[in-house]
Amino acid sequence: AELYIIMCVQTVLFIPAGPSNLGMQTTLSENMEDDMERVSLAKELSSTTYPGRGIVIGRTKDGKKAVTAYFIMGRSENSRNRVFVEDGEGIRTQAFDPSKLEDPSLIIYAPVRVLGNKTIVTNGDQTDTIYELMDKQQTFEQALRTREFEPDAPNYTPRISGIMHIDNGEFNY
């Protein structure tokens, strides 16, 4: 079965990465069905030579099941030397070949962690920051404000983060 994503075509805001855009926040409403269009994830990813890292949070086509996904690619040999492993209820990356691991700081992290009824999905080590601060009763937004772009000049990779709440068979994100 092909996985589809729903993109909000009128509200998507692309903010260039980098130090000059610190503090810019984008909040999207949960109920924007009128502004959304269904697109094929496979088609979207295959239309670019380097999709990089990405997260998907949403629901199946019939709206009955929650969907959370994370994907990565790597430009450097160090970035390509990683695999996903289960870690409790979450996922983390680890070196495929530890002898080839150079700098683990931007490639070894937990992109998915579960805190109670919340599944946190991100493209970097901010997953741990969000998890730890939410565990101390801070909000998702408060946790995000403690972090900035990745220190990988000249790219300054944006930190992408999402959260899904599941409660009594219902879910929102």
Residues of each region from the PLM?
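Conserved short alpha-helical segments that host acidic/polar catalytic motifs at enzyme active sites
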Residues: 28-173
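N-terminal amphipathic/basic-hydrophobic helices that include classical n-h-c signal peptides
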Residues: 1-35
